[in-house]
């Protein structure tokens, strides 16, 4: 068994001697801003389309290691390039939501019926607010979190993907709302709204999705928490079970 200090050193080395040097500055798009993220093992670029999720998550990661590890100016500069790209290129101003995928220059390519780009933008702006003291970024973080929760939880906001013949509730929105609210609380401080969402999501995950008798966390359940005995209802995602814990 590897001792805990050895594990800490192992992961530290993997992150800062392997992962970060592979991605940066390779991923930074010096031409259009934001980040490229489709690379082969040898570092060659295999696709230059940009996931909007990735723009938020990469910006968040850079700002997190900037605050928690070392304040390298380039990490902040690169993260701010990602935030600028998100703000200027990734928002559909017809409804205020974000796109899912754009071309390298930011031309919109695809938009999903669900909203997750917004949640990753929220944590990125919250991290920037904490790193720089920017009230504008704090406001944007709260704005995108509100957009995300409204789209996922208010009735009739998202276009239906199924008929009402077999209604299901999904773990995904609760899982991401929980971790997003926790991250905003960490970086921006506690608030009644964030506490509400954290408590609600923990309660719903525990009461609807966790099946202690089966030792599983379901991905989709009936509205009353019962298991739907069909492919969608039997789906398990161990990664989501860990993430929701």
Task: Please tell me what each predicted stretch does.
Residues 1-245:
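Glycan-recognition and catalytic cores of secretory/periplasmic carbohydrate-active enzymes
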């Amino acid at each position: 068994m590897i001792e805990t200090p050895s594990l800490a050193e192992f992961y530290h080395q993997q992150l800062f001697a392997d992962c970060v040097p592979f991605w940066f500055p390779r991923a930074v798009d010096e031409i259009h801003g934001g980040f490229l993220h489709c690379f082969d093992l040898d570092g060659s670029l295999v696709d230059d389309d940009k996931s909007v999720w990735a723009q938020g998550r990469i910006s968040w990661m850079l700002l997190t290691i900037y605050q928690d590890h070392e304040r390298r100016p380039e990490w902040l500069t690169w993260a701010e390039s990602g935030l600028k790209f998100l703000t200027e290129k990734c928002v559909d101003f017809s409804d205020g939501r974000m796109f899912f995928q754009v071309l390298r220059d930011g031309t919109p390519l695809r938009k999903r019926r669900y909203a997750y780009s917004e949640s990753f933008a929220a944590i990125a702006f919250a991290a920037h607010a904490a790193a720089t003291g920017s009230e504008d970024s704090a406001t944007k973080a709260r704005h995108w979190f509100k957009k995300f929760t409204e789209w996922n939880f208010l009735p009739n906001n998202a276009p239906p993907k199924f008929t009402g013949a077999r209604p299901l509730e999904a773990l995904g929105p609760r899982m991401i709302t929980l971790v997003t609210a926790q991250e905003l609380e960490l970086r921006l401080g506690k608030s009644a709204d964030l506490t509400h969402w954290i408590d609600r999501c923990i309660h719903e995950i525990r009461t609807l999705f966790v099946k202690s008798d089966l030792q599983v966390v379901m991905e989709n359940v009936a509205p009353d928490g019962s298991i739907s005995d069909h492919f969608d209802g039997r789906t398990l995602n161990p990664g989501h079970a860990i993430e929701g814990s």
